[in-house]
Swiss-Prot record:
Enzyme class label: transferase
Domain of life: Bacteria
Its EC number(s): 2.7.1.50
Positions of ATP binding: 120, 166
GO biological process terms held by the UniProt record: thiamine biosynthetic process; thiamine diphosphate biosynthetic process
Keyword field: ATP-binding, Kinase, Magnesium, Metal-binding, Nucleotide-binding, Thiamine biosynthesis, Transferase
Transmembrane regions listed in the UniProt entry: none
Listed name of the protein: Hydroxyethylthiazole kinase
Purpose of the protein: Catalyzes the phosphorylation of the hydroxyl group of 4-methyl-5-beta-hydroxyethylthiazole (THZ).
Molecular function per GO: ATP binding; hydroxyethylthiazole kinase activity; magnesium ion binding
NCBIfam families reported for this sequence: PRK09355.1 (NF006830), thiM (TIGR00694)
Source lineage: Bacteria, Pseudomonadati, Thermodesulfobacteriota, Syntrophobacteria, Syntrophobacterales
Pathway noted in the entry: Cofactor biosynthesis; thiamine diphosphate biosynthesis; 4-methyl-5-(2-phosphoethyl)-thiazole from 5-(2-hydroxyethyl)-4-methylthiazole: step 1/1
Stored CDD domains: THZ_kinase (cd01170)
Amino acid sequence: MLAETARCLEKIRAQRPLVHNITNYVVMNYTANALLCLGASPVMAHAVEEVEAMVELADALVINIGTLSAPWVDAMFLASRAAIERSIPVVLDPVGAGATAFRTDTARRLLDEFGITVLRGNASEIMALAGLNSTTRGVDSVHATDEARSAAVELANVYKAVVAITGAEDFITNGPKSARVANGHPLMGRVSGTGCVASSIVAAFCAVHPDPLVAATAGLSVLGIAGELAARDNPGPGTFHHLLLDALDAMETRNIEEKGRIAVSWEQ
């Protein structure tokens, strides 16, 4: 799996897939820079007048509901429909699902009406979308990854999608198969945007690998390794935020081989 992760990163840097992000205002700039440092090409476009045309150019689509409004929801549906028609991967980031009915209902409609490739969220978001009682603090999770594992498997089976829960340890499943990624650093939870960046990085990996379970696992491992490298000298959160971009840019095969911690299980 580590060798496959390294090959995916090489493909991203060689092919520079265009990742179309309909994402939130909070993370838009940081996400674009993270994709550039990874080796992909980002575009941030959410106007209903152009999202379908932009999807025609893209290699993957990210739908992030972090700063929702009615026009953005319309754009998300238009873009998702266009992406499905083109058979390009779609990654849904249900930011804050469970916190408000608007967020939860929007995420569920996207799941119900479109063939989402990967659903990437924190434990509280995944539990909420599975209809379980969960607690959120704004858009932050108060549940651990293991608490949401069964919910992730259920959602993966229902929607025929890959579901990825990110946290202290990441859990990725397509229902019958699953993987765990133990890479990362606590500083990743002390700055805004790392979860949203994770979704966009997963989309870039999905653009170059046909198996979304492998792609999501590889992408989350690379981001986690970058977090570990960025935290080597115990920086403060502000410095870490910038060092994470540098670590993505400097990522090499040897970093993946030396630091990657991926465990794969082929049956639940």
